[in-house]
Amino acid sequence: EPKENFTMEQLLWKGKMNFSYKYDYSAAGVRRSVEDSLQRLGLSSIDVVFIHDLSPDNGDMKDSYASYFEQAVKGAMPELSKMREEGLIKGWGLGVNTIEPILQTLDVADPDIFLSACQYSLIKHDDDLNTVFPKIAERGMSIFVGAPLCAGFLSGKNRYLYDGTFPEGVKEKLSALKRVADHHSVDLRTAALQFAASPDEVSGVIPGAHTAEQAVQNAHSFHAKIPADFWEELKHEKLIALHAPVPKV
């Protein structure tokens, strides 16, 4: 398949390997990671590289997040920009579960895109909506939304995100969302995916899927019709922000 016919993204992350690992956000480390990936993939370039989990919620980093971020500012970030100029990659950014690294990176580097996970969903969206999206818009950038279903919480799984806990109020909010969805005969998973894709700043949504059937269902959800009254009731009940973008009917 000719390279121009598909998009290839790459995460700088530990993955699952049969040997130990360490976080290396130096210039040499990031270049080695990208060049090794190009060799394994048999490609001459990668469209997007995300620095993954460079975030204060990363338990591996313990209290050393600031030093890891500083290493990336001096090493990985300028090196990725250099590789962009060389044509090895087309763009780079961060893939993180919190907004702080995104805001910090916007202040010190020239990224192209971000993957913001766990921050924009029917359950929780204020931080991305009010803080991240305006800054993204100012720079003419875009963002991918990760975990729009809150790791399955909005599609029937008995878990909220990834740490095994249920923050205060999330179960009650889910019940309220289900009540409105049932009233309008709307599939809540479908509504959650369309909600995540609605802001102009969002260029992609990444829902998880365990099976091919789930992947197909997710794709179909983006084309389903949802009545405007459903979104109006969510706003009336203060289940989503009044200024949150919703799908155009």
Protein language model features and the residues they cover:
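A short acidic, glycine/proline-enriched capping/turn motif at secondary-structure boundaries
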Residues: 1-2, 56
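Short, flexible, mixed-charge acidic loops at enzyme active sites
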Residues: 2-12, 159-160
